[in-house]
């Protein structure tokens, strides 16, 4: 597809369904900096879930950043300065998908790895009238918080490893900390009361687990959730027998969270 005189690409997975099926939710999955849509398709593990849970998965491709020659998303990050109109691209992409596919426009979600997670936060700020909920894995919120004035509260999930050296959990000169990002969204979504904290079991037997922090009493039935994983770095957590082992399977955690929300609140 063409946007702003640039040929843009994406991969799409549409689950097998009867012709008379109801409109399907849509998950946009954004790759990280220096990565690709094809790579994102391979490591996220979304496609089996898209088949079993009946949602459409779309993997957009970022443009090449002129200063580095690497694929990226313009997440309004000072660490990855860009002039690419990726918000406009996503709007055009959503217009095309809703015209050509049977999309439930009340249940469009954005997820991403690293720079793709940063892009998901930007979409929560800029396109809250279209994006029902988001998840960031190893990303953080890089957009200026003073400009994040969406039209509605947006449910947010963050998955992050304590040992992440690329986007540090406790922040850096380039990236805000994960606790600060979660606190912003808890306030933005009008969450009240203390967060609920539970342990994530050490199912791999390596001596490490994690924590789940959830703000549940938020405006319009929204929630804010943080999954913190011990001894995990800048990685997309996967728990698949015979493959890489983590204490959670990110794709399942993400879908279990997202599927409960629409543009009109929680528990769809």
State each model region's role.
Residues 158-160, 164:
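Short beta-strand/loop motif that positions the catalytic acidic residue
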Residues 110-112, 137:
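Short beta-strand immediately N-terminal to the catalytic nucleophile in serine-hydrolase-like folds
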Residues 154, 186-268:
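Alpha/beta-hydrolase-fold serine-hydrolase catalytic core, especially in secreted/extracellular enzymes
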Residues 165-177:
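Conserved alpha/beta-hydrolase "acid-adjacent" motif
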Residues 3-17, 21-109, 118-126, 147, ...:
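Serine-hydrolase catalytic machinery in alpha/beta-hydrolase-like enzymes
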Residues 25, 107, 154-155, 224:
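Alpha/beta-hydrolase fold active-site loops
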Residues 129-140, 155:
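A conserved short beta-strand
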